[in-house]
UniProtKB/Swiss-Prot annotation:
This is Ribosome maturation factor RimM. An accessory protein needed during the final step in the assembly of 30S ribosomal subunit, possibly for assembly of the head region. Essential for efficient processing of 16S rRNA. May be needed both before and after RbfA during the maturation of 16S rRNA. It has affinity for free ribosomal 30S subunits but not for 70S ribosomes. The keyword rRNA processing applies. SUPFAM superfamilies: PRC-barrel domain (SSF50346), Translation proteins (SSF50447). Residues 103-182 form the PRC barrel domain.
Length: 182
């Protein structure tokens, strides 16, 4: 893997996908993209991976569709053995490479850890994950330890204006119109 070189850790890393199993004998790998449009993963370069605690830059040589998969060829990865060493490596970029969003749009990473409060002031907990359901995104909220309703986790739809009343990334709070009993 002579074409890979050591890199500095990204300031604000974000995972865009993951390398899957090798494909064929010439160093190709399957790739699993976490971007909204699977092919958008190729818009962000350079890719970084972390192997044995070291950050490395990997250079994309080529990519293509194969059946339902996307497969990639990285520079310097020329055989199945070299490709197998990269299986399960996360594909990471610095979040500064992401495009600016329009008002009212948010990256999931920016919502993680935000405190969620109802319009009446009841603290529902903190956002620990997000889910895509097809019709809308859903906040996964870990409830406070002493939740009055005995709820450990809440799923709240991210419906801007309807359920989501205000997102303040400066104070890391999300105000929702939601019944705490759900």
């Amino acid at each position: 893997m002579s074409k890979q070189h050591t890199a500095q850790a990204p300031v604000d890393p974000i995972v865009l996908g993951k390398m899957g199993s090798s494909y064929g004998i010439r160093g190709w790998l399957r790739v699993f993209s976490s971007t909204e449009d699977a092919e958008s993963i190729f818009d962000y370069q350079p890719w970084l991976i972390q192997k044995a605690g070291q950050w490395q830059v990997v250079e994309l040589e080529s990519w293509r569709h194969h059946n339902q998969d996307i497969i990639i060829k990285l520079k310097g990865v020329d055989d199945r053995d070299a490709a197998n060493l990269l299986t399960n490596c996360e594909i990471i970029v610095d979040s500064s490479q992401l495009p600016e969003l329009e008002e009212g749009d948010y990256y999931w990473k920016d919502l993680m850890g935000c405190q969620v409060v109802t319009t009446e002031g009841y603290s529902l907990g903190k956002v620990i994950d997000m889910m895509e359901t097809g019709s809308n995104d859903v906040l996964v909220i870990k409830a406070n330890l002493k939740d009055a309703f005995g709820i450990k986790e809440r799923l709240v739809p991210f419906l801007d204006g309807q359920v989501i009343k205000k997102v303040d990334l400066t104070t890391r709070t999300i105000e929702v119109d939601w019944d705490p009993g759900f």
